[in-house]
From Swiss-Prot:
Coiled coil spans: none
GO MF: DNA binding
UniProt keyword annotations, A-Z: DNA-binding, Host nucleus, Late protein, Viral capsid assembly, Viral release from host cell, Virion
Comment field (misc): All late proteins expressed from the major late promoter are produced by alternative splicing and alternative polyadenylation of the same gene giving rise to non-overlapping ORFs. A leader sequence is present in the N-terminus of all these mRNAs and is recognized by the viral shutoff protein to provide expression although conventional translation via ribosome scanning from the cap has been shut off in the host cell.
Organism of origin: Canine adenovirus serotype 1 (strain RI261) (CAdV-1)
Pfam family, one: Adeno_PV
Protein name per UniProt: Core-capsid bridging protein
Subcellular location: Virion; Host nucleus, Host nucleolus
GO CC annotations, alphabetized: host cell nucleolus; virion component
Family under the similarity heading: Belongs to the adenoviridae core-capsid bridging protein family.
Length: 421
């Protein structure tokens, strides 16, 4: 019933208010112009209509740009702080407890510079006195083919504060890789003095270059032969450093006596060695004369120079750490002797060295057959210690369910053991 009444209402509504999607009629009234032929009368057009026509024609003539530029991300000015950079000469005052506000707008003096700002920059005064790079007026090099050998050092002359002459020795660019041989100056008449004149380098610096050319010549042929022979002979050291006595070297091992692998680690006796303090040796410096010296010179005696004791760290009590060898076992496929360090000698400590603390190692039953008992070493000590042996408790032989016998002093999980009653 509801569906029928709804259909009736919809049909009535379409008759009364049909759904017509048409552009709405414009309510703008246009002036109707009545034209008559052969009438010499000017048509009356209202001023309001003239404005509308002019606006319409202007819209048609101009091209409309949808977007002139690419979209830009707006800069977030809110919350930004401007860092104040005061000009040189402005005192910066710090008031404790008072927060500095944001930079205010520039004053009139900061926007407009002084009238003679160019003269100030040229004379390097006021704000141009510091932190400004000097303008170079010329980069002329009067000696382009020469390279400096010595640094340019000033010559201090008393009484002349303004003039400060400097001296620098130059050499031809081609001879900089050659061996510098001793040279002698020729006669004084060959020296040439050339004045390059005064030249302004910077607005406040002028340089007057005076070149003094001194020709040089090599020494005699005998001296050249000596230099050539010295150059061809092999180089020999003239200073030798050696020890007056051999340094003492002590070797440390793990600190545990060689014993069977299947013994409990608590039964093995640790050994500690007290390291001896090394006496500082006296170093001898031997000075020798070279073989190619003059034959008239006598051989210089050997000078013994005693060097003071070398300050070093106090030696460790237990020896170097690289003498600690871990307890390891080879795979059954490897047949090699176990590396054992030499037996230590010296005092025996109560607790043993720190390098004797090793965890207990237990092997899988498949590796038991590859381990053999180490042969006891002969002790080189003159004094023997009496060892008290206690009878071990009787333990039934243990084996796995497959029949492999296990050592008696190692505890296994009950799930893999099989003991015969």
């Amino acid at each position: 019933m509801a569906a029928i009444s709804r259909a009736i209402k919809q049909e009535l509504l379409e008759d009364l208010k049909p759904e017509m999607y048409l552009p709405p009629k414009s309510t703008r009234r246009r002036a109707k112009v009545k034209t008559e032929e052969k009438v010499d009368v000017k048509t009356l057009v209202k001023s309001k209509s003239k404005k509308r026509r002019a606006a319409k024609n202007e819209l048609e003539e101009n091209v409309e740009f949808v977007r002139r530029f690419a979209p830009r991300r707006p800069y977030q000015w809110r919350g930004r702080q401007v860092r104040a950079l005061p000009r040189p000469g402005i005192p910066v005052v710090f008031t404790p407890g008072q927060r500095s506000g944001v930079a205010s707008k520039r004053s009139y003096d900061e926007v407009y510079a002084d009238e003679d700002v160019l003269d100030q920059s040229g004379n390097m005064i006021n704000e141009f006195a510091y932190g400004k790079r000097v303008k170079m007026l010329t980069h002329k090099n009067p000696t382009p083919s020469q390279v400096p050998i010595t640094p340019q050092e000033p010559i201090a002359r008393p009484g002349e504060a303004r003039l400060l002459p400097t001296v620098q020795v130059l050499a031809p660019r081609d001879s900089k890789h050659e061996t510098m041989l001793p040279v002698t100056k020729s006669e004084g008449g060959d020296v040439k003095v050339e004045n390059k004149g005064f030249e302004q380098i910077t607005p406040q610096l002028g340089v007057q270059t005076v070149d003094i050319k001194v020709p040089v010549k090599r020494k005699s042929e005998v001296e050249d032969e000596i230099l050539k022979r010295a150059k061809m002979e092999p180089f020999e050291t003239t200073v030798k450093m050696e020890y007056s006595e051999q340094p003492q070297v002590e070797v440390f091992d793990t600190g545990v006596e060689p014993s069977s692998f299947f013994e409990v680690r608590s039964q093995a006796r640790p050994i500690a060695v007290a390291r001896k303090r090394r006496v500082p040796t006296v170093e001898v410096m031997e000075v020798q004369q070279s073989d190619h010296t003059a034959p008239t010179a006598s051989a210089a005696p050997v000078a013994n120079v005693i060097v003071g004791p070398h300050l070093s760290r106090r030696p460790s009590r237990w020896g170097p750490a690289n003498a600690i060898y871990p307890d390891y076992v080879y795979h059954p496929s490897i047949s090699a002797k176990k590396i054992m360090g030499p037996r230590p000698t010296g005092r025996v400590s109560r607790w043993g060295p720190a390098n004797s603390i090793f965890p207990e190692v237990r092997l899988h039953p498949s590796m038991v057959s590859a381990v053999t008992r180490a042969a006891p070493r002969k002790s080189t000590k003159s004094r023997r210690r009496r060892r008290v042996r206690t009878r071990r408790a009787f333990v039934l032989p243990a084996g796995t369910k497959t029949g492999v016998m296990l050592p008696q002093n190692i505890r296994y999980h009950p799930s893999i053991l099989f003991r015969r009653a």
